Amino acid sequence: MKFTKLYVPTTKEAPKDATLPSHQFLIRAGFVAQIGSGLYNFLPLGKRVLRKVENIVRDEMDKAGANEVALSFVVPGELWKQSRRYFKFGKELLRLKDRKDNDFLLAPTHEESIVDLVRDKVTSYKQLPLHLYQIGLKFRDEARPRFGLLRCREFIMKDGYSFHASEADLKREFDLMETTYTKIFSRLGLNFRAVEADSGAIGGSGSKEFMVLAKNGEDDILISDASNYAANIEAAKRAKRVCKAERPQSNSMQKFFTPGCSSIAKVTEFFKVDPFYTIKAVMKKAIYEDSEKIVVFFVRGDDELQEVKACNACSALELSDASEEEVIAAGLVPGYCGPVGLHENIDFYIDNELENEKEMICGANEKDYHAIGVNIINFNKDRFKDLAEVKAGDKALDGGVLSVTKGIEVGHIFQLGVRYSETMGATFLDENGKSKPFFMGCYGIGVSRLVAVMVEASHDEKGCIWKKECAPFMVHIIVSNIKDTEQMQFALNLESNLESSGVEVLLDDRNERFGVKMADFELIGVPFGVVVGKGLQNAEVEFIKRDGLEKVKVSSDEILGKLKEII
C-alpha cells in the first residue's frame, strides 16, 4: 500500500481532553477521528486494526462452536418492557419513537433481542445447547464519555448468548468461554487476568471480568499473593478480620452521653477503643423503578461501604447520598444511628463480618448518645450482606495477602440463569415433556475498546507500538528521497516481493522531508521499518524494530530474507 493512496491525517497536536496515550496517539496517528462526545469514526488504519481484532475473536468463537448472527441495532421498546429493563436501565438507554409513536431504543446489549430470536423456534431439549454471537454496534449514553475509545457512547462489541437445558450445562459453557477468552486475549499479546466481578445491570450470577493490567486502568483489582485469586473491587471478598487491640468490656448494653461525637474518630477517642469495635452507619437514598427510600448500611468503624455491594444488597437501581434533611425526615438521627432499636419502618443491612459480634459500640438512635455492650445477635439472616470494601493488605480467603492493581475491562462473561427466559416466556420441552425456561449465558468483548487497550499497553513517548498480530501493516518502508530513482525502485521491488509473500507493507512514497516520514513511522507504530536512503549506494539499508527503536544496517541483498524470517 502506497502512503500517497492511503488516508492518514496525522497531526502533531492531540485534543486538549486527550489525557491517555491511547487517546492521543490514535487521533494523532489518524486511526480514528472524533465527531461528537463519545463518538468516533474509524479511518483506514484504525479499520485495519479493528478487522484483525474481529478476525481473532471470530476465529476463536467459531472454534468453540458458536454461530455468528447479526441483530438489529434498533430494538423495539416492547421487548425491553417484557424483560422489565426498559425503565430500569436508566439514562444510559437511548430511547426514541418512530413516526407512529412506537417506542424503540438503540441497543446497549442484546439479551432481549436474542431471547426473542430463539423463543418459539427452539422448542425442545434436542435443539440445545445453542450459542449465538455477533460483532456489532452498541450505544450507551454515558454521562461522562472520556478516554477516547475506552469509554465512549457508541462502540463495537462481540456479544454472545448461550441457551441450555440445565444449569450444569450452562456452567460447562461458561468454563469453555473462559478458556476461549483466554485464547483470544493471549493471541492479542495482552497481559490480563480473569477476575471475579459484579454482574451489574445485566444481572445473573457467576460473573467474571477479563482485565488488562495497565497503570491507567479505571478499575481497581484485588490480587492474592497465595493463588490465582483476583477480583474487581466491587466483588472482592476477604477473610474475616481480627483485631489485637483490647475489646471494650461491658456486662450489658448501656447508653452513654457522648455530646458532639458524631464521627467514628470522635467516638473512638471518647471511649479510648480501636475503631474495629465500633459500628459505622452509612445512610443512602436507594432509587427504584417507581420509588425511593432511605436505607442504612452498617459496617465496622474502620471499614468503608462498597457502594456496588450496598446497591445489590437492597436491590436498588442506584444509590445516592442522602441529605441531612432526608435522613431526619425518615426518623433517623445523623451521627448517632445504630442497628439496635431502629424504627421498624427503616430498611437496613449489616455487614456479614458483624454477625454475632459482641460488646460493640454504636449509635443509640438518640442525639448525643451511644450504646456500648451491643451484641449483633437475633437479627434476621436476610439483614446480613457483604458490604465492606476490601482493601490492600487484607487477608485473602486463600490465606494470602491482597494487593491492589489497576486494570481495563476488555471482556465479561455471565451466567444469567433463567432471569430473561422466565420474564420473557422463553421455554422448551425437556426429555419428560415438561416446559422449562432456558438457562442462559452471556459473553461480551469490547472489540473497539481493544484497539485502544493495545496502544495503552504498548507505546512509548513517540507513538504506538503495535504487536504483529494486529498491526495495520507489518513493514513500513521509508524512502529518504523519492526523486532518487534507485531508492524508489528498490523500495518498490521490496514492497512487491513482501506482498507476494503475504506480508502487509506500507510504502511511504510521499514527497515529504525525511524527518516528517520518520516521525510518522514512530507515531503510527508499524512493527518493522526499512529506511532506503543514501546507504543504498553501499548496498545497505537501515532496519528498525519499532519496539525500542533499535536500528541496524543490513545488506540490501539480505533485507528481504531477514524480514521474512522475523515475520
Swiss-Prot record:
It is an enzyme of class 6 (ligase). Pfam families: HGTP_anticodon, tRNA-synt_2b, tRNA_edit. It is found in: Cytoplasm. One of its GO terms (molecular function) is aminoacyl-tRNA deacylase activity. It catalyses: tRNA(Pro) + L-proline + ATP = L-prolyl-tRNA(Pro) + AMP + diphosphate. It comes from the Bacteria. This is Proline--tRNA ligase.
